[in-house]
Amino acid sequence: MDHWHAPYLGLRHIPPELTEFELNTFFTFSAKEHTLIEARRNHLYRLALALHLGFIRMTGRTLDAYKQVPKVLWSHLGEQLSIAPPEIGTLRSLYETRPRTLIDHQQLAQQALGFSSMTEHQRRYLVRWLKETLVGRPDPSTLLMQVKGWLYEHQILMPHDRQLKRVIAEAIRSHETFLELSLIHI
């Protein structure tokens, strides 16, 4: 993962001001992704699926229907898909009568990009990785960003920061216990 990508990881909303670079990097699609998008029934669902694909690629997290979508992004997606951009600010109106479609789009986007939810096995592996990362490092303040990078590189959807902080705290406690036991046995 490139260093410039780190600030986007775990965002829960689309930045209101997207640059041309961000639009092209996260919301421009491969031929395979275009095929997946074009398989949707209507224009709005095509735009919505494209939005979900780009958001996961940008943040490593799924987008809910209540977040604002900047007009510049709707325009960019419309241009990408040769569809007139909608005049809606959020996806809420699109999914209001069909909430299952939101979940379907989120799952389709994460599958297309190879992302999945964290399993218990992956959580334990993450704790073990964190304990190794803590060796010789007295300052755990950068761990949250490192965890987000690790999750993205392993194509694991970002849980809420609260859950990530609990995993970090568990790793720190385990590491401190290990250090205490090491000192006792010296």
Write out the residue ranges for each language-model feature.
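Linear-motif-rich, low-complexity cytosolic tails and juxtamembrane regions
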Residues: 2-18, 75-172
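Conserved small/polar residues in nucleotide/adenosyl-binding loops
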Residues: 184-186
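Charged, low-complexity surface segments at secondary-structure and domain boundaries
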Residues: 31-39, 58-63, 90-95, 111, ...
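A broad "ordered helical/assembly scaffold" signature
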Residues: 14-16, 47, 54-59, 65, ...
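Alpha-helical structural elements
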Residues: 21-24, 50, 69, 124, ...
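N-terminal-proximal low-complexity accessory segments that begin disordered
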Residues: 3-53
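Amphipathic alpha-helical packing elements
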Residues: 40-80
